[in-house]
Amino acid sequence: MSHLVLTPGTLTLAQIREISRGKVTLELAESAIADINTSAGLVQQVLDEGRTVYGINTGFGLLANTKIAADDLQLLQRSIVLSHAAGTGQYMQDATVRLMMVLKINSLSRGFSGIRLEVINFLIALVNAGVYPCVPEKGSVGASGDLAPLSHMCLPLLGEGEMSYQGQLISAAEGLEIAGLKPIELAAKEGLALLNGTQASTALALEGLFNAEDLFAASSVIGAMSVEAAMGSRSPFDPRIHAARGQKGQIDSAAVFRHLLGGESEISLDHVNCEKVQDPYSLRCQPQVLGACLTQIRHAAEVLGTEANGVTDNPLVFQDTGDIISGGNFHAEPVAMAADNLAIAIAELGSIAERRIALLIDSNLSKLPPFLVENGGVNSGFMIAQVTAAALASENKTYAHPASVDSLPTSANQEDHVSMATFAARRLRDMSENTRGVLAVELLAAAQGLDFRAPLQPSKAVAQAKGELRELVSYYDKDRFFGPDIEAATDLLLTASYNAYLPAEILPSL
């Protein structure tokens, strides 16, 4: 478990990845406290002066013009949390909720939200205790923020809802007891500040980003394995080709392949006098395809890194002037578009990998035994494993349709254009799982192909990757129950061990 001293607005992608992948304890930097207190004081000043300001002493959405009496302000905060906790579907994973909470703490602590330190410390205490609110996956359109998910996240502050602790569902009362907390009463604006924001969609999109990075690394390593297994040419990775085009992602991807394949190997030397003029695109154009995916991953990283540190509450409190201004930072269009781009990248990584599998099992193209097995006919080898990969790759093509182009008005047309960011981000987990499955099949196929090339040896990095797999899955000498092999290869990919094969500067969060 790592410990993070949080200076609001300074989270790095590496820190966010660590929070996403493991438990963390938080401590708020002392430098943040003054801004939090000043911001909360300005909200109290509005009430003391009897002014009417949206989000502080008014209704919400279409009811924004309804002024709320001072005696009803605490009830209003409770009511908005309870009424907006209207999500549905399965609960998000604890890791997702943990990240969502840290992002909300990060945003609230910047001093633009008019929320008391007591409320922020309550959320920090839950994170530190490892007690997480139960948040349904569905119910947000990504504007006005992620209202339903964040409402469920905040129910325990009121002593309501369910929580998760060490994999078990418990009541909010039990969860608060574990964390040493008691329910609190929210003051003016605090309910809206807690619920308004893009932290649910951003957390899901960041998880998608980290999965996409892992898949890019795996695609590079396994793609290099397939080049060796198919006795492919190294010339398509020549740096002069990629410099002539000038696409940064492509240039970097080609460099990764040169790093993985090395200058030469026994396999490549044996291939010198090959009569084949060119390799199929799935081998030859890997830098062009994977490089384009890398560009989308990097762009999404920039957008999501900014969003993770941004303030997406409404209205915002500006300490230098005392102004409280209503805007639309809750609209998650940047997150939705970043997630859409990640979806395309994840789908393409799986699509080209499936084509490499098809190449390897086709003896006319690879010059390997049909379906990568001896005694074909009696043995079917990788025949149906490739069908599985095709099914997964095709499923992702449907998932990759952009979500951000959809919109459905809500709140009696007051909220008449929305981002659909939460779905855009949420589907990335399923897409990543599908592409991981495709790559698992390719990993098995490439290793099998390399075994058929023996005694010729591949590059050092490719041999190492093959060796890691062979510690888990043996050579496929005859037909056997294939499912466990795919599962073992998938588990290997889930360790993200292939990230270490790439230079550190390639992926944004590493």
UniProtKB/Swiss-Prot annotation:
GO cellular component: cytoplasm
Cross-link 5-imidazolinone (Ala-Gly) per UniProt, renumbered positions: A143-G145
Residue positions where 2,3-didehydroalanine (Ser) is found in the record: S144
Subcellular location: Cytoplasm
GO molecular function annotations of the record: histidine ammonia-lyase activity
Pathway noted in the entry: Amino-acid degradation; L-histidine degradation into L-glutamate; N-formimidoyl-L-glutamate from L-histidine: step 1/3
Post-translational modification summary for this protein: Contains an active site 4-methylidene-imidazol-5-one (MIO), which is formed autocatalytically by cyclization and dehydration of residues Ala-Ser-Gly.
Gene Ontology BP, a term: L-histidine catabolic process to glutamate and formate
Disulphide bridges: none
Main location: cytoplasm
Enzyme class: lyase
Family the entry assigns: Belongs to the PAL/histidase family.
Name recorded for this polypeptide: Histidine ammonia-lyase
Organism of derivation: Shewanella pealeana (strain ATCC 700345 / ANG-SQ1)
Lineage: Bacteria, Pseudomonadati, Pseudomonadota, Gammaproteobacteria, Alteromonadales
Gene: hutH
